[in-house]
A protein has these predicted regions:
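N-terminal pre-triad scaffold of radical SAM enzymes
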Residues: 9-17
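Charged, compositionally biased N-terminal leader segments and the immediate start
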Residues: 1-2
Length: 175
């Protein structure tokens, strides 16, 4: 690669998004585990295996411990960082949570095997990312801050670039 150029890094999302989008996040941990080592050997930048609806689905529909799932995946992925999708101030839920709850959840996520938090706010309100970014940095995790793309008169390239720069200033390791 030419000097000064950055490589494109690929995150595999099949362990979270594929079954979240296709079958309402109903894959059990036992269905997921057999493929983890194969995915780990491919050379991805990260495996997004947790977050989004996985936590809720484990508890409500699969009768599984989501923390145990995370630890089992991490145990099998020896080479590839584990990534999660984190809804900013909403954590993995459907409402805002207090800062101390966000901080504690981030701390426990990293302690149980998450290396990279892909943090987003569906409305692109960076204030809803601030606490999670600070907590992730405090725990030495990788902050992948997210800009949600859509089209409208308000959503311009300039606004997306401005937001990306704000996220960089807030401590994002990647966008």
């Amino acid at each position: 690669m030419a000097k000064g150029k950055k490589a494109v890094e690929i995150t595999e999302t099949v362990l979270r998004d594929a079954h979240q989008s296709l079958i309402a996040t109903r894959m059990t941990t036992e269905q997921i585990l057999p493929i983890v080592e194969k995915l780990d050997n491919i050379g991805y930048h990260s495996l997004e295996a947790w977050g989004g609806a996985t936590f809720d689905a484990c508890l409500r529909f699969l009768n599984e411990d989501p923390w145990e799932r995370l630890r089992k995946i991490k145990d099998r992925a020896k080479k590839t960082p584990i990534q999660m999708l984190f809804r900013g101030q909403n954590i993995l839920g459907y409402r805002h949570y207090a800062d101390d709850i966000v901080e504690y959840f981030v701390q426990k996520s990293i302690a149980n095997g998450v290396d990279i938090l892909r943090i987003f706010d569906a409305l692109n309100d960076v204030r809803n990312l601030e606490c999670a970014i600070k907590a992730c940095k405090k725990e030495k995790g990788h902050v992948q801050a997210t800009v949600c793309y859509t089209t409208s008169e308000f959503h311009t390239n300039e606004k997306f670039v401005k937001m990306a720069k704000q996220l960089e200033e807030m401590g994002a390791d990647s966008i």
